[in-house]
């Protein structure tokens, strides 16, 4: 990922007209965000994503930014990278913003900070949506509505769900994980949200009214920096020299970290 706009349009091939339609029809105050999104989305999305989807995604993300105190304080860099994207890794593309905003904005609209909002969301959304953790989930990399339909998800699917709910209400959020703990006891995924700095939490694992507390803290503290096996990675659509190692697709190296 990571192209200039002209290169992205070339990669789009026969879908170029859809991207140009999105660029030409986006409101002026959203044009920088649309250009960033098209320049940074996965190459495979450039080839089949619709203008209608892009315009809706961009508009709803900006609406959430404008309607929340924390959203209005965000830099463009944080907003573009951790609120505007419609996906985290390789999960199915879904239109979740309207549904999640309508469901969960009323829950957090009076929160004093994004920190406080995320604490509330992590306590309530999984019961509200009827999703639990289970190793019997259909697949690891479920998109939100796939997890809702199944009623269950892995830590990966739960994290994707919490991140997308956070983004729907203007909270910068990102997918974090390790391919393998230092003691070879397994992998794990979790969520980081921005409130002046990055804070972590386990999806569907609330710890009272606090972030930065979890059962996996000690394991995470022993991760090996720079190791593609024992390291910790945060997914991003920014240009980087690293990729996010996905256990469910071990040979795919297209998502940045």
Residue ranges, per PLM feature:
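N-terminal low-complexity, Pro/Thr/Ser-rich intrinsically disordered segments
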Residues: 1-4
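Catalytic domains of carbohydrate-active enzymes that cleave complex glycans
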Residues: 6-10, 14-22, 28-63, 205-257
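Secondary-structure boundary elements
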Residues: 17-21, 27-150, 186, 240-241
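Hydrophobic/aromatic-rich core segments of domains that either
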Residues: 106-107, 111-113, 117-119, 123-124, ...
């Amino acid at each position: 990922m990571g192209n200039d706009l002209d290169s992205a349009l070339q990669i789009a091939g026969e879908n170029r007209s859809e991207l140009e339609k999105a660029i030409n029809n986006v409101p002026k105050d959203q044009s920088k965000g649309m250009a960033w999104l098209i320049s940074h989305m996965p190459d495979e999305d450039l080839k089949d994503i619709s203008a209608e989807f892009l315009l809706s995604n961009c508009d709803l993300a900006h609406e959430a930014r404008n309607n929340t105190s924390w959203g209005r304080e965000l830099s463009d860099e944080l907003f573009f990278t951790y609120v505007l994207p419609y996906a985290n890794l390789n999960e199915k593309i879904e239109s979740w913003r309207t549904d999640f905003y309508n469901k969960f904005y009323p829950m957090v609209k009076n929160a004093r900070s994004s920190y406080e909002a995320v604490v509330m969301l992590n306590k309530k959304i999984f019961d509200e949506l009827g999703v639990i953790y289970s190793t019997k989930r259909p697949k690891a990399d479920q998109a939100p509505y796939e997890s809702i339909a199944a009623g269950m998800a892995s830590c990966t699917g739960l994290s994707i769900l919490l991140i997308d709910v956070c983004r729907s209400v203007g909270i910068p959020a990102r997918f974090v994980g390790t391919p393998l703990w230092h003691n070879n006891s397994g992998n794990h995924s979790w969520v980081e949200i921005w409130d002046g700095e990055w804070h972590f939490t386990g999806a569907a694992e609330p710890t009272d009214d606090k972030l930065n507390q979890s059962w996996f803290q000690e394991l995470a503290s022993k991760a090996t920096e720079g190791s593609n096996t024992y390291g910790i990675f945060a997914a991003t659509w920014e240009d980087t020299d690293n990729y996010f190692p996905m256990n469910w697709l071990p040979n795919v190296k297209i998502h940045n970290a």
